[in-house]
């Protein structure tokens, strides 16, 4: 009887549609990468134990988002590059890569990336095989990140769960960014963030999801929103403490990019000004 029950439960779980996303609303310590990594590992293990297939941490989580002048007024470029930034193939990122493989999950992390003599505000997505599935560097800022080089590409990654794109924090306030990802085929957009959150942000994130027909995960140290392609919040954080927010995303053929087919791109050439 017990064996039958276990088999039944397994069959139901296996048949459940979509994929389970875990948004980690975690507040890191400035400059304390070892402590932040230990906390990430602890929460990622909890999320994976509860069935998460995709785990997302906030913007700049690894180093504590010290690259923003509002957070670190006395920051210098030399200190930022030397003490905050990490190479994607360095020891700490290799450890996180191994964690994704060990837990058999997709794991997204925000960090200051050292690359080609510059520093980028980057979100990297590691696959369940421990490989780099995607890497996106923040392309829009409010001039409060003077030592970060702006990214210039919006990659869309094909996975077994669908096509995924990434924006970082202020990128989300520029509507063209999410639209470009949708036009490139993204059905889910991950938005690791740090700055503003609250009622107006909740509305904006729902609009971004609805107007582009995409699932959207907003992951902030004090706020998480998981929104489906109809603009409905399917899960959200409670309070502002460290926590995990779970939500199941599906790719609906009916809702995916629902509004895009009515566009008339030939009328919008003025948008490139």
Annotate each PLM feature.
Residues 27-30, 61-64, 114-116, 142-143, ...:
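Solvent-exposed loop/turn segments at secondary-structure junctions
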Residues 17-29:
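Short beta-strand segments enriched in small/hydrophobic residues
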Residues 1-7:
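Sec-dependent signal peptide recognition
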């Amino acid at each position: 009887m017990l064996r039958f029950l276990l088999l039944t439960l397994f069959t139901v779980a296996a048949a459940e549609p979509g994929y389970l996303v875990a948004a980690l609303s975690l507040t890191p310590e400035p400059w304390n990468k070892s402590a932040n990594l230990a906390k990430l590992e602890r929460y990622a293990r909890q999320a994976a134990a509860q069935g998460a297939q995709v785990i997302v941490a906030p913007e700049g989580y690894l180093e504590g988002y010290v690259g923003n002048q509002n957070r670190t007024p006395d920051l210098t470029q030399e200190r930022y590059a030397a003490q905050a930034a990490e190479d994607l193939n360095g020891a700490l990122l290799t450890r996180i890569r191994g964690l994704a493989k060990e837990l058999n999950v997709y794991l997204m992390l925000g960090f200051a990336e050292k690359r080609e003599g510059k520093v980028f505000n980057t979100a990297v997505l590691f696959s369940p095989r421990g490989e780099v599935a995607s890497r996106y560097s923040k392309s829009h800022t409010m001039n409060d990140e003077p030592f970060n080089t702006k990214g210039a590409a919006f990659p869309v990654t094909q996975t077994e769960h669908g096509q995924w794109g990434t924006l970082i924090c202020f990128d989300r306030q520029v509507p063209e960014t999410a639209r470009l990802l949708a036009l490139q085929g993204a059905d889910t957009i991950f938005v690791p963030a740090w700055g503003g959150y609250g009622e107006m942000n909740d509305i904006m994130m729902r609009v971004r999801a609805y107007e582009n027909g995409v699932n959207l995960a907003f992951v902030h140290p004090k706020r998480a929103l998981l929104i489906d392609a109809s603009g409905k919040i399917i899960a959200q954080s409670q309070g502002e403490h460290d926590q995990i927010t779970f939500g199941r995303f599906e790719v609906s053929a009916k809702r995916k990019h629902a509004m895009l087919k009515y566009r008339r791109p030939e009328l919008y050439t003025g948008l490139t000004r």
